[in-house]
Amino acid sequence: VPRDVTLLCRGEVQVRDVAEALLLHDDAWGVRALDDGPMMQVCRDATHPVITVLGVRRVDELDEVTRLLPDAPALPVPLWWVDTVTPFDADGERGVTAALEASLDLDAVCIVHGD
């Protein structure tokens, strides 16, 4: 079962921007596109993903964020909602740490679900 991690970015981002910010956590990691590009997976090697960036959506209504993430802090809109998932294992923990660090570079709030 994967763990969901949501990034709420104050500025416009694309999937590649998020993947590049995640890669800063470990310079030995790599990235690969899934499904011809709409999703990107950050991996520690060819067979061990640490976090997958599923997509980015612009959100223009704070009510939508509040409805889906009632514990999220109030942020100005528009914002960019980034969906990611990590494995529920040691690699996934590395992915969560990378997401928390990337949130600083992306001017984002990072919400780790299931913690």
Where are these regions (language model features)?
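Acidic (Asp/Glu-rich) sequence patches and key acidic residues
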Residues: 1-115
